Swiss-Prot record:
Gene name as annotated: CUL2
Gene Ontology BP term (one): response to jasmonic acid
Glycyl lysine isopeptide (Lys-Gly) (interchain with G-Cter in NEDD8) cross-link, renumbered residues: 686
UniProt keyword annotation of Ubl conjugation present: yes
UniProtKB keywords: Isopeptide bond, Ubl conjugation, Ubl conjugation pathway
Stretches assigned to the Cullin neddylation domain: 672-734
One GO CC term, this protein: SCF ubiquitin ligase complex
Protein name: Cullin-2
PTM note: Neddylated; which enhances the ubiquitination activity of E3 ubiquitin-protein ligase complexes.
Organism: Arabidopsis thaliana
Coiled coil, from the record: none
GO molecular function: ubiquitin protein ligase binding
InterPro entries per UniProt: Cullin (IPR045093), Cullin_homology (IPR016158), Cullin_homology_sf (IPR036317), Cullin_N (IPR001373), Cullin_neddylation_domain (IPR019559), Cullin_repeat-like_dom_sf (IPR016159), WH-like_DNA-bd_sf (IPR036388), WH_DNA-bd_sf (IPR036390)
Transmembrane annotation, as ranges: none
Subunit structure: Interacts with SKIP17 and FBW2/SKIP18.
């Protein structure tokens, strides 16, 4: 036994000398030379020889235990006293130095005792040599000093936050101590340092938030908050572990932004409303950047954005309504005001789309806010006129020759058409818009001979992209009819040149319209003057050569005539409607006619005739003289050709005040809606077979909302009607459930 111990002690004395030399090097003892290769090999060989003897002369266990004791002694006798005597930043520097020394010590000793790692630790499932060294430091040094180190680091971070310069490299190395003592995991860093950092940061920024909120405006506060977040991210990059960033940022965001969100965003003098009011786009962009990463952080901003747009848009509607109800406003003035309103809404939309795109980075929340705001005021009426009609009138105005009021160039017109379509998105009654648009389109195509076909088709293409082919099918059909009408006219002229017997004595142009495409018009059995009868019969003869299956129905209300009025002073070219022309041509054969005589000869209704005679005798151009002279037409009146009439122009257009078609259009749309609701209900029930009342109504609204917002009461009425017509039936056990009857 004595011999055995002597071998172990002799070998260990060699190892102790090597360990002592290494520790002197680490402690920077003057004149201590480094290891030479022979010394390193001697130490390795000593361990090898002690651990490769056959039992009972294998000293692996004893050497392994004494290896661990080396660290315990070094940490207790050298490392801990050196760190304990220092404080604050100096203590941190010593801790960093000792951790660096520990890593060197472990690396060198692991090399000297390498044979243990290769065989002993593996066979016995013992901690590796490196683990033994680091566990010793963790248990003896780190556990005692981590709390003091944490306090010192937090103090330095506080100084840096207050603007002082600190040694960032030192902090990075201290953080490495926390991470390294987790033995490959971050648990020590997270529990012993990070959790306290997050708590301390929350307290720090909570205090700052209270102070900044009292001292600063919303824009200035946001600048400080944004800078704080930037610095905290920079702090992580410089010396904290990367996994800390999302946690630290979340803490700062919570204290600087979430906790004070209501006070900050809704600040009466400088919050979101004020920024929107004063067009502070940079500040709004900053508000977006700050609140975008926070869950639901943008909700109050988007809500205020919506409110602001709604207020501005509603103010425009109110302004237009007041102008429209002004008793001093003329009819033409009202039309101009309507067009001004649409231009204002387009400009408003352009303005806030810039906000959405540039300030709010096209975020869907702000697109939604913009849409909902515009839907509020774009569906209000202006002095009883629906926005659908106003928008249709605006389209009509800019598509007329010369761009109507706005006098737009081609490029500007195309851009304006795109913006009109964007406004149409927000109008609920798109079917009503379609009817008003189609009615006005018909008049443009028929009477605006110099209209731009390209822009007409361009707008319909945009409508189709937005609302589908069904929305534009009739409108496109009208354009096709106008193209075919030119072909018909060319063929008609050729027909007349071949058939010499059919001499008209005047220029006669006919436009053939397809009934299904065009709006419905009132037809009358007007007794045409003989001059017109010949023309009509000639075209009938021509059309009969083209088709036998189609019947022509003449719509005189859409026709125009150019008459040569031979007055005493000069001949004036008079442009009138077909009806007006029929009245005037009666006076070619007589100077005077009574109301009753005109009524009988033309076969017109009282209302229509009164309107015609009023336009010819009571308005600007008094081509007929009425007796007695009054502003109203009576069935006892007599009319005489006014040979004394004259005008400075050689060509005049005698207007026929249009009848108010609004009521009829609305009635037609309501009728079409009933059919649409019926079709949607049947389609849904045919697919679902059995469905509850609430779900059926809900699905019906969803089906139809693209074109109009169906009235719930109307849907219920249509359901009852379908039940009475045996399309649906109520479930006998549950009256709120419907069944489809095939």
């Amino acid at each position: 036994m004595a011999k055995k111990d002597s071998v172990l002690e002799a070998g260990w004395s060699v190892m102790e000398a090597g360990v002592a030399k290494l520790q002197k090097i680490l402690e920077e003892v003057p004149d201590e030379p480094p290891f030479d290769p022979v010394q390193r090999m001697q130490l390795y060989t000593t361990v090898h020889n002690l651990c490769t003897q056959k039992p009972p002369n294998d000293y692996s266990q004893q050497i392994y235990d004494r290896y661990g004791g080396v660290y315990v002694d070094y940490n207790k006798q050298t490392v801990l006293p050196a760190i304990r005597e220092k404080h604050g930043e100096y203590m941190l520097r010593e801790l960093v130095k000792r951790w660096a020394n520990q890593k060197i010590l472990v690396r060198w000793l692991s090399h000297f005792f390498e044979y243990l790692d290769r065989f002993y630790t593996r066979r016995g499932s013992h901690p590796t040599l490196s683990a033994v060294g680091f566990i010793s430091f963790r248990d003896l040094v780190y556990q005692e000093l981590q709390s003091k180190a944490k306090d010192a680091v937090l103090a330095l971070i506080h100084k840096e936050r207050e603007g002082e310069q600190i040694d960032r490299a030192l902090l990075k190395n201290v953080i490495d101590v926390y991470c390294g003592n987790g033995m490959g995991e971050l648990v020590k860093y997270e529990e012993d340092f990070e959790s306290f950092l997050l708590e301390d940061s929350a307290s720090y920024y909570s205090r700052n938030a209270s102070r900044w909120n009292q001292e600063n405006s919303c824009p200035d506060y946001m600048i400080k908050a944004e800078e704080s977040l930037r610095l905290e991210k920079e702090r992580v990059t410089n010396y904290l572990h990367s996994t800390t960033e999302p946690k630290l940022v979340a803490k700062v965001q919570n204290e600087l932004l979430v906790v004070v969100a209501k006070q900050l965003i809704e600040n009466e003098h400088s919050g979101c409303r004020a920024l929107l009011r004063d067009d502070k786009m940079d500040d709004l962009a900053r508000m977006y950047r700050l609140y975008h990463p926070i869950p639901q952080g943008l909700d109050p901003v988007a809500d205020l954005f919506k409110q602001h747009i709604t207020v501005e848009g509603s103010a425009l509607i109110k302004q237009a309504t007041e102008a429209a109800t002004d008793k001093a406003a003329s009819t033409s003035g009202l039309k101009v005001q309507d067009q001004v309103l649409i231009r204002q809404l387009i400009d408003l939309h352009d303005k806030f789309m810039v906000y959405v795109d540039e300030c709010f980075q096209k975020h869907s929340l702000f697109h939604k806010a913009l849409k909902e705001a515009f839907e509020v005021f774009c569906n209000k009426t202006v002095a009883g006129v629906s926005s659908a009609e106003i928008l249709a009138t605006y389209c009509d105005n800019i598509l007329k020759t010369g761009g109507g009021i706005e006098k737009l160039e081609n490029e500007d017109l195309e851009l304006t058409l795109e913006k009109v379509v964007k406004l149409l998105v927000y109008i609920s009654d798109k079917d009503l818009f379609a009817e008003f648009f189609r009615k006005k389109q018909a008049r443009r195509l028929l009477f605006d001979r110099n209209g731009n076909d390209y822009h007409e088709r361009s707008l319909l293409t945009k409508f189709k992209e937005l609302l589908g082919a069904q929305f534009t099918s009739k409108m496109e059909g009208m354009l096709t009819d106008m193209t075919l009408a030119k072909e018909h006219q060319t063929n008609f002229v050729e027909f007349l040149s071949v058939n010499k017997t059919k001499k008209l004595g005047m220029d006669f142009t006919v436009t053939v319209l397809t009934t299904g495409f065009w709006p419905s018009y009132k037809t009358t059995d007007l007794n045409l003057p003989i001059e017109m009868v010949n023309c009509v019969e000639a075209f009938k003869a021509y059309y009969g050569t083209k088709t036998n299956s189609r019947r022509l129905s003449w719509i005189y209300s859409l026709g125009t005539c150019q008459l040569a009025g031979k007055f005493d002073k000069k001949t004036i070219e008079i442009v009138v409607t077909t009806y007006q022309a029929a009245v005037l041509l009666l006076f070619n054969n007589t100077e005077r006619l009574s109301y009753t005589e005109i009524l009988e000869q033309l076969n017109l209704g009282h209302e229509d005739l009164a309107r015609l005679l009023h336009s010819l005798s009571c308005l600007k151009y008094k081509i007929l003289i009425k007796e007695p002279m009054s502003r109203n037409i009576s069935n006892t009146d007599t009319f005489e050709f006014n040979s004394k009439f004259t005008d400075k122009m050689r060509r005049i257009r005698v207007p026929l005040p249009p009848m108010d078609e609004r009521k009829k259009i609305v009635e037609d749309v309501d009728k079409d809606r009933r059919y649409a609701i019926d079709a949607a209900l049947v389609r849904i029930m045919k697919s679902r077979k059995v469905l509850g009342h609430q779900q059926l109504v809900s699905e019906c609204v969803e089906h139809l909302s693209k074109m109009f917002k169906p009235d719930i009461k109307m849907i219920k009425k249509r359901i009852e009607d379908l039940i009475s017509r045996d399309y649906l039936e109520r479930d006998t056990d549950n009256p709120n459930t419907f069944k489809y009857l095939a």
